[in-house]
């Protein structure tokens, strides 16, 4: 029997979706299908063709197509959802919830119809609530519907720590718990540089400032760009998760997982440390938390629940 390449579909061909597609192809993780709405079919095809034409120069073998027809996504191994509207001036987060929830429902129906055995990774904001929507709509088991926020939040944290210490980002590990918002909980106690606890290397006031900057990391970029939000680091974070699943790496990565009692929470999607491998979320790792960390997590959960109350 011929070996088949893996197939990854990316829903939403905006900056994040297109960047994700390009990185996936470059890493030769599989053939890539980039999907957007019919009104944007030509630009989507154009982006895909442009990427494909980079393949001889960069030396990667992956087919990339752009489409608005979900039939082209049939039998995907992984589907990444980046579709949705971004917040515009004058819009409340509530507006975002209602519109993006509708989009998630439509997208999920199509995804499930053509790829009933796929794994789904959701990036669309507010991501905790949108991942929950996709989970409900898909009827998939919890290990196959995953949200991305922690890899990105942790990457930001690691970047700021490496800058502070003037060292390689490769030597910094960190963990961010909770919702993807201003109440996220970077766990400094479980963060290291070259195996040395950060608390031994960075004074408390500087660490606190790094934590605060991490929480506001997305907003910092939104303000600098003036139009739109981050896409390079979010795309890179998605690719790391896709790779962990497709290669069954069993990586310990923060991901938005469905909790059934872990950390004392039930029936909610939340950012937690997980083992990510060939079966998607294979395990939620429960860390011992201090009272202060538990309180911070509870506040983060409350923020997520407030958004979830807006779901139809």
From Swiss-Prot:
Family the UniProt entry places it in: Belongs to the LDH/MDH superfamily. MDH type 3 family.
Protein name, as recorded: Malate dehydrogenase
CDD domains reported in the protein's UniProt record: LDH-like_MDH (cd01339)
Single GO BP term: tricarboxylic acid cycle
Residue numbers annotated as active site: 180 (proton acceptor)
Function: Catalyzes the reversible oxidation of malate to oxaloacetate.
Organism: Geobacillus kaustophilus (strain HTA426)
Keyword Oxidoreductase: yes
Top-level division of the source organism's lineage: Bacteria
EC number(s) reported in the record: 1.1.1.37
Positions bound to NAD(+): 12-17, 36, 100, 123-125
Keywords, ordered alphabetically: NAD, Oxidoreductase, Phosphoprotein, Tricarboxylic acid cycle
Gene Ontology MF, one: L-malate dehydrogenase (NAD+) activity
Residues that coordinate or bind substrate: 87, 93, 125, 156
Cross-referenced InterPro entries: L-lactate/malate_DH (IPR001557), Lactate/malate_DH_C (IPR022383), Lactate/malate_DH_N (IPR001236), Lactate_DH/Glyco_Ohase_4_C (IPR015955), Malate_DH_type3 (IPR011275), NAD(P)-bd_dom_sf (IPR036291)
Modified residues (Phosphoserine): 149
Catalytic activity: (S)-malate + NAD(+) = oxaloacetate + NADH + H(+)
SUPFAM superfamilies, per the entry: LDH C-terminal domain-like (SSF56327), NAD(P)-binding Rossmann-fold domains (SSF51735)
